[in-house]
Design a protein with these regions (language model features):
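A conserved active-site-flanking secondary-structure segment within enzyme catalytic domains
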Residues: 135-165
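Short beta-strand and adjoining strand-loop segment in the mid-core
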Residues: 128-143, 169, 186
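Conserved active-site and cofactor/substrate-binding residues in soluble primary-metabolism enzymes
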Residues: 32, 36, 144, 173, ...
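Conserved anion/nucleotide-ligand pocket segment
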Residues: 161-191
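Generic secondary-structure signature for well-ordered alpha-helical cores
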Residues: 46, 151-154, 187-191
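Extended, subdomain-level signal for the structured scaffold at the beginning of enzyme domains
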Residues: 1-118, 127-130, 159, 183, ...
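Residues on a specific face of well-ordered alpha-helices
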Residues: 39, 143, 147, 151, ...
Length: 191
C-alpha cells in the first residue's frame, strides 16, 4: 500500500523496485485529471499485492494546494526540497503559468537533466514548454487550450490525441485521458 502524502514514508526513496513518482500540484489543478492519472497506479499496486508505484505530492511551496473544485491537498514537499523521481506528473490549472515561478521551472529542468520522465496532464504542457523541455516534440493538452498553446509555442507541434509520448516526455489531454496514459505505462512496465 502506498504511503500517504505527508507521512515520513512518503518522503523516503522507493524500495524493492517501486517507481517513484513526484506529483507537482499547482493551485486550482484539476482534481479529475489528477485522479485519472494517479488511480491506475494505486489499483496496480493493489492488484499486484505489492508496491509497484510510490508517489509524493510536491508544491511550489510545501503546504496546502487547492484544487479547482476547492478540495485542498497537502504537499509535504516543495520544489526547493531535494527530490529524485523516475517520473514527474505536472498537474496545473486553466491558468498554468500563474503559479509557475522560476523555482518550478528550474525544478522541472533539474529533474529532466537527471533523466526523469516528465508527464504533463491537462495544461501542464505550458510549463514544460516554458521550461524549454518540449522543443521538437508533439504534445497534446486540454482541447480548450490547444490554440493558445500553439500560438505561444509555435516550435512545438500539437495534436488532438488523448495522449502523446515522445522519449521521456508524455502529455495528455486532461480530464480522464490520464487513465489511458497511465494504463499504457503500467502495461509497458508490468505487462
Amino acid at each position: 500500500m502506498p504511503a500517504r502524502a505527508g507521512s515520513p514514508a512518503a518522503t523516503a526513496e522507493p524500495t524493492g523496485g517501486a517507481i517513484d513518482i513526484a506529483v507537482l500540484l499547482l493551485p486550482r489543478f484539476s482534481l479529475m485529471a489528477l485522479a485519472s492519472v494517479l488511480e491506475p497506479f494505486r489499483v496496480a499496486n493493489r492488484l499486484a499485492g505489492r508496491e509497484l508505484y510510490r508517489w509524493r505530492f510536491v508544491g511550489a511551496e510545501a503546504g496546502r494546494v487547492q484544487a479547482s473544485s476547492g478540495l485542498p491537498i497537502t504537499t509535504g514537499l516543495s520544489v526547493r526540497d531535494p527530490i529524485t523521481a523516475r517520473r514527474v506528473i505536472v498537474c496545473t490549472s486553466f491558468e498554468p503559468m500563474a503559479a509557475a515561478g522560476r523555482a518550478v521551472l528550474a525544478w522541472l529542468r533539474r529533474l529532466d537533466a537527471a533523466g526523469a520522465e516528465l508527464w504533463a496532464v491537462d495544461t501542464g504542457a505550458f510549463l514544460l514548454a516554458e521550461a524549454g523541455l518540449l522543443a521538437g516534440r508533439t504534445v497534446t493538452l486540454h482541447w480548450e487550450s490547444l490554440a493558445a498553446f500553439a500560438e505561444l509555442h509555435d516550435g512545438v507541434a500539437t495534436s488532438r490525441s488523448l495522449f502523446e509520448r515522445s522519449g521521456r516526455v508524455a502529455t495528455c489531454a486532461g480530464g480522464t485521458a490520464g487513465i489511458d496514459l497511465a494504463l499504457t505505462a503500467i502495461a509497458a512496465e508490468h505487462g
